[in-house]
C-alpha cells in the first residue's frame, strides 16, 4: 500500500467516511474530477477495480483507520 501518494491516502480516508467525490473536492479545494483521477490512479497502482475494495485494502493494511 505504500505505492499510493499522501493525497490519495487523504482522499481514501474521506471515501471511508462516506464522502462523495464532489464533497471531497469541496473539502480539499480541488475539482471532483481531480478527486476521481486520484482514486483511479490509486486503484490502478494497486490492481483494484472497485472503490469499496480500495477502502477495504487501505483499512486492512493500516493506511487509514
Regions found by a protein language model. Name each.
Residues 51-62:
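Short, basic, alpha-helical segments at the C-terminal edge of helix-turn-helix-like DNA-binding modules
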Residues 20-53:
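Recognition helix of helix-turn-helix DNA-binding domains
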Residues 8-15, 54:
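Short alpha-helical "packing" element that flanks the helix-turn-helix/winged-helix DNA-binding module
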Residues 14-16, 33, 59:
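Short amphipathic helical patch at the helix-1/turn junction of helix-turn-helix
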Residues 3, 61-65:
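Short hydrophobic/aromatic patches at helix-to-coil boundaries
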Residues 18-21, 64:
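A general structural signal for well-ordered secondary-structure junctions
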Residues 1-7:
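Regulatory hinge/linker segments at domain boundaries
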Amino acid at each position: 500500500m505504500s505505492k499510493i501518494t499522501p493525497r490519495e491516502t487523504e482522499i481514501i480516508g474521506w471515501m471511508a467516511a462516506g464522502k462523495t467525490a464532489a464533497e471531497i473536492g469541496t473539502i480539499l479545494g480541488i475539482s471532483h474530477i481531480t478527486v476521481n483521477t486520484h482514486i483511479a490512479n490509486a486503484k490502478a497502482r494497486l490492481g483494484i477495480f472497485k472503490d469499496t475494495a480500495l477502502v477495504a485494502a487501505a483499512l486492512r493494511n493500516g493506511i487509514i483507520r
